[in-house]
């Protein structure tokens, strides 16, 4: 099947992937745009895994303060070179992720950051909620509830507030694939007026 340049351009605009990668994805998908996007997203995840071990010493710290002045976020996002750290795309993603933290209140960056004792406590709570269920399905239900917990409390597992078809980790992986560098959110702090105070 011959893939038109218009189709390649359209896919490139949607994903930010290289022309050759777009052409290959479209050929593999038989010209189906949605399948091609999925192929590129999977490739981005594979690229991200390869680059995950590389050192990220450059980056930026962004600050976001909600318009009412009651919520603020500081977020550190790192990459390998200052060249990537200075790009508009990198800065925009970091700023949008700070907005994500302000809106969605994650507690951790990645699921690996959740302490084992917190996970065990959550599992105990879930088991207590479904203690009358047969034992063979209890573990499946507990694992399902734990996944939902991660989607709430881990930034990377959250649905992106500006595009509910993607998770935050998908956006990071797409930028890794596009820049060829390891990129990660290192940490964030969220502030809210009155939070943590009791009378």
Curated annotation (Swiss-Prot):
GO CC terms, sorted: cytoplasm
Cellular compartment(s): Cytoplasm
GO terms assigned for molecular function: translation elongation factor activity
Involved in Mg(2+) ion dislocation from EF-Tu, as annotated region: 81-84
Gene3D superfamilies tied to this protein: 1.10.286.20, DNA helicase RuvA subunit, C-terminal domain, Elongation factor Ts, dimerisation domain
Record bears the keyword DNA damage: no
Record keywords: Cytoplasm, Elongation factor, Protein biosynthesis
Xref: InterPro entries: EF-Ts_dimer_sf, Transl_elong_EFTs/EF1B, Transl_elong_EFTs/EF1B_dimer, Transl_elong_Ts_CS, UBA-like_sf
One Pfam family matching this protein: EF_TS
Coiled coil: none
Family listed: Belongs to the EF-Ts family.
General function of this protein: Associates with the EF-Tu.GDP complex and induces the exchange of GDP to GTP. It remains bound to the aminoacyl-tRNA.EF-Tu.GTP complex up to the GTP hydrolysis stage on the ribosome.
Name of the protein in its database record: Elongation factor Ts
Organism: Thermotoga petrophila (strain ATCC BAA-488 / DSM 13995 / JCM 10881 / RKU-1)
């Amino acid at each position: 099947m011959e893939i038109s340049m218009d189709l390649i351009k359209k896919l490139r605009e949607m994903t930010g992937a290289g022309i050759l990668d777009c052409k290959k994805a479209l050929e593999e998908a038989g010209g189906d745009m949605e399948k091609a996007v999925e192929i590129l997203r999977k490739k981005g995840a594979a690229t991200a895994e390869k680059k995950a071990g590389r050192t990220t010493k450059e980056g930026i710290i962004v600050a976001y303060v909600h318009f009412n002045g009651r919520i603020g976020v500081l977020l550190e996002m790192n990459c390998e070179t200052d060249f990537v750290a200075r790009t508009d795309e990198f800065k925009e993603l970091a700023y949008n992720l700070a907005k994500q933290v302000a809106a969605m209140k994650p507690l951790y960056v990645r699921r690996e950051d959740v302490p084992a004792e917190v996970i065990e406590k959550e599992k105990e709570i879930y088991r207590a909620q479904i203690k009358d269920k047969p034992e063979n399905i209890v573990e499946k239900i507990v694992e399902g509830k734990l996944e939902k917990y991660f989607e709430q409390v881990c930034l990377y597992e959250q649905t992106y507030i500006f595009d509910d078809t993607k998770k935050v980790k998908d956006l990071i992986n797409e930028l890794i694939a596009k820049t060829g560098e390891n990129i990660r959110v290192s940490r964030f702090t969220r502030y809210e007026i009155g939070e943590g105070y009791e009378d």
